[in-house]
UniProtKB/Swiss-Prot annotation:
High-conductance magnesium-selective channel that mediates the influx of magnesium into the mitochondrial matrix. Essential for the splicing of mRNA group II introns in mitochondria by affecting mitochondrial magnesium concentrations, which are critical for group II intron splicing. It also suppresses a variety of mitochondrial intron mutations and its absence may disturb the assembly of mitochondrial membrane complexes. The gene is MRS2. It comes from Debaryomyces hansenii (strain ATCC 36239 / CBS 767 / BCRC 21394 / JCM 1990 / NBRC 0083 / IGC 2968) (Yeast). It is found in: Mitochondrion inner membrane. Belongs to the CorA metal ion transporter (MIT) (TC 1.A.35) family. CDD domains: Mrs2_Mfm1p-like. GO terms for biological process: mitochondrial magnesium ion transmembrane transport. This is Mitochondrial inner membrane magnesium transporter MRS2. Keywords: Ion transport, Magnesium, Membrane, Mitochondrion, Mitochondrion inner membrane, Transit peptide, Transmembrane, Transmembrane helix, Transport. A motif (YGMN) lies at residues 373-376.
Length: 476
């Protein structure tokens, strides 16, 4: 199958090897991009683990050399048992005394799978400091993404689910303790194995390994961004038609996930930007052909090949950041508009309730006089011809007067723009006719005295105000 399998001394018939190799080539080149292929393989693996039937197979094209954390020669052939498939993708439990990693040699062959090293021995063998191990050690805690150069020995990479050490002749990929990341890490190892086996040309080994890591990271960022755009975009489109409580709750959940993705993308972009701005780190990343960095030289060394590679992925990551930021702004704008609509509806309900209260108060006051009139007491108007009419008219006038005065007070404290029946804004007229109407008694009864009188300051007061503004002389 591959050299890595022969290194593990697994006896497989040559015909089976040829069939597997041809199938792998067809499987690798039938996809348009790495993202589509990874999504298809992830889907197959998920269906395999969750399907109730026993006919599920390992997705074609996945290297057995990295899927199985505990190799057994008799189990290299794909099996139909879904439990065995799950065990092959089982993550590694963190240990305080050991580190677990898979090693690729300079030809792309896997020389060790999930091999455990004592931490102190591992640090001494790779000329690392204990603080460096925190960035790459197997842990369930997410660490800030980083690419640290330890010239001239290695490059420490910690991006998303990938924690690796790149040397001039080998790559060490550390295992994960998170079950959901184990599958992603397996797909990355498959990509790394394929790319390291391809002809290198003039590209250094460490740059090919670093580019494989960046490709994997960008592919997963792109897939996550696509999911966020589809999910949030659908909810935003639905909220334009109807404001629903469940939709707002879903938008809140997706907004939190989008913010987390945005933060990760920004951190990765900052890592690439720091590398591009630091010539010393760029020089230290040349492990195969070391370059000595001298800051005193006026014309620094040209890192065109490395800068072009990093800049291309920096622009791609920056594009993801911009799209995610734009989507976050759309969500915030939608939230603000929804809040404005809800506040307007709430104020409309409060205004409607106040109007009902005003009318209720008017009718209550109007029935006060008839209540006195209807008492079984002598009021000296029982025999009057106009008594009933006078009481009725006076009660109605009294109720209308209370309603008018109440609406007058309500208009003074009302802050919203009132709408008339036709949907037009009610603006106060500034024409001469409107000013003349304001002087009428019934206009002042409904709307109050709108004329605000200001007394002009005296010359002495004007002088004091002028001195206060200019602060030229102390006040006397």
């Amino acid at each position: 199958m591959w050299t890595s399998l022969r290194h593990l001394k697994c006896s497989i018939p040559r015909q089976s090897i040829n069939r597997c190799s041809s199938g792998l080539s067809k499987q690798f080149f039938k996809y348009k991009s790495t993202v589509s292929r990874n999504q298809d393989i992830l889907k197959k693996i998920t269906d395999t683990n969750t399907h109730a039937m026993n006919t599920a197979d390992i997705p074609e094209g996945i290297s057995e050399s990295f899927v199985d954390h505990q190799f057994e020669p008799n189990k290299l052939v794909p099996t139909n048992d879904k439990k065995i498939i799950y065990n092959r993708l089982k993550p590694i439990t963190p240990n305080d005394s050991y580190v677990s990693c898979t090693i690729f040699d300079i030809k792309g062959n896997i020389t060790a799978v999930s091999r455990k090293y004592p931490k102190m021995k591992f640090l001494k063998g790779n000329d690392l400091f204990p603080r460096d191990l925190r960035k790459i050690d197997t842990s369930s805690i997410d660490v800030v993404p980083s690419i640290m150069v330890r010239s001239p020995n290695c490059i420490l990479v910690n991006l998303l689910h990938i924690k690796a050490i790149i040397k001039k002749d080998s790559v060490m990929v550390f295992d994960t303790s998170t079950p959901s990341i184990a599958t992603k890490l397996g797909l990355f190892m498959y990509d790394l194995e394929m790319k390291l086996k391809l002809p290198s040309g003039n590209i250094c080994y460490e740059f090919r390994a670093l580019e494989s890591i960046l490709i994997s990271v960008m592919s997963y960022l792109e897939a996550d961004l696509r999911n966020h755009l589809q999910g949030c975009g659908l909810i935003l489109a639905e909220l334009e038609d109807e404001i629903d409580r469940n939709k707002l709750q879903d938008l809140l959940i997706k907004s939190k996930k989008l913010s987390s993705f945005y933060q990760k993308a920004v951190l990765i972009r900052n890592v690439l930007e720091e590398l591009l701005d630091n010539d010393e780190d760029l020089a230290g990343m040349y492990l195969t052909d070391p370059i000595k960095f001298d800051p005193t030289i006026e014309n620094p060394t040209d890192f065109a090949d490395l800068e072009m590679m990093l800049e291309s992925y920096y622009k791609q990551c920056d594009e993801f950041v911009q799209q995610a930021g734009s989507l976050i702004n759309d969500i915030k704008a939608t939230e603000e508009i929804v809040n404005i609509i809800l506040d307007t509806n709430r104020n409309s309900l409060m205004l409607f309730e106040l109007k009902i209260t005003v009318y209720t108060l008017g009718f209550t006051v109007a029935t006060l006089l008839p209540a006195f009139y209807g008492m079984n007491l002598k009021n000296y108007i029982e025999e009057s011809t106009f008594g009933f009419g006078a009481v009725a008219v006076f009660s109605i006038i009294q109720g209308l007067l209370i309603i008018m005065l109440s609406f007058r007070k309500l208009r003074k404290v009302q802050k919203l723009t009132m709408m008339d029946g036709a949907g037009n804004h009610l603006h106060h007229s500034s024409s001469p006719i409107g000013l003349m109407n304001k002087d009428k008694w019934y206009y002042r009864l409904f709307y109050g005295n709108r004329h605000t009188k200001y007394d002009r300051p005296t010359p002495k007061e004007s002088d004091v105000i002028w001195r206060m503004i200019n602060d030229d002389k102390p006040l006397k």
